[in-house]
Amino acid sequence: MSQQCKTVLDNGMTVISRTKPDVRSVSLGLWFNVGSRDERPDQAGLTHFMEHMMFKGTPTKGPLDISMHFDRLGAELNAFTSKEYTCYYARFVDDKLEDALSVLAEMVIESNFSQDAIDTEREVVIEEIARSEDTPDDYVYELYSQSNLPNHPCGLPVLGTRDRVGSYRHADCVDFHAEHYHAGNLTLAAAGNVDHDQLVTLAKRYFASMKPGKKEHRKLLQPQFSSGLFSQKRDIEQAHIVYGVPWLPLGNERRYIATVLTTILGGSMSSRLFQEVREKRGLVYSIYAMQAGYQGVGQWCIYAGTRPSNTQEVMRLIRSELDAIAQDYVSEDELSRNIDLICGQLLLGLESTNSHMVRLGKRETLGLEQTTPEQQTEGYRSVTKQQVLDMAQELLSAEPAIAVISPYSQEELSDLVFG
């Protein structure tokens, strides 16, 4: 039987865990309450750059030493940066807990940010930016976000820009680390065959030297959304389209309705958009709907990739499906089938210790209630057909922002999209 526990240490650090004694693995994450939205204009991409630098050595371990240490543990080691948090995580066999945690702690507390390592890693991140820009089905989301939220930090790319990343020096890293990498801004989340009391004891030992503090509370700016057509002309084989509208912020009480609506429209192979645009007409390979909720702001969008000559027809079909669902064309069977899908995927995902760890760490870092899977499935099953229809009408009435990367000019696209 699994058990969830939480402890706040004297230095402000939070330790939260879910014990699953029926497995041998442990997934452990160090979650820092800092993301790209917390950067000043002169720090664009610095949060993500710092994530890279944490792997580049401490006074006692070089980057190869760190990699070899986790290899010897038979462990997975990685990290990621989002708009609202940064996470360093490892997955390992349960008897390697102290060996893994001690080095993770050393990485985030004692990284030395040598100028040689910074010079090399700047080039690595610039290559990462180039890879993203060369992937139009990825980069079209950046175009959409930057155009839809032009004066909001959630509209800016997590990776930053070449110019800013190319300018970072030792002092920038030291100052950013001192400002954000303190105990009050850190949640240690673990799931698997782990004892909570042992985890707390180890956290006290290995994070004793970390600067204490209180959790940072970010100032939430009022979002100003822009609508219209935003395009980038490229010599490519497909038109990559994102059609989006302002949406619910993180933790909104209507989030269960929103997920059901999104799934009906474009969340599976039986969804409206997949069936109508791909299966019946063969106009796309990839089409789906998604939502992104952040503190104080949210976005909802549809992505489609199609032959440029099909752009107008795909846009027509997207609007047609939005209109249909808003006009009461949802059966009780379709509603229940999609709710079953959501609940089933939720429960299947929680068989992984990593999924449990991410769930714990993300919700604690963002100040969300630690709801149980049972509470979530109950929330989805309480959604009614009328609630879905009402939300669909709101979605349809919102002014969209449409981002397109294609061989067409802005003028040509305007005729196709709005003509």
Positions of the model-derived regions?
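M16/MPP (pitrilysin/insulinase) zinc-metallopeptidase core fold and M16-derived inactive scaffolds
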Residues: D22, S27-R91, I264-L283, Y294
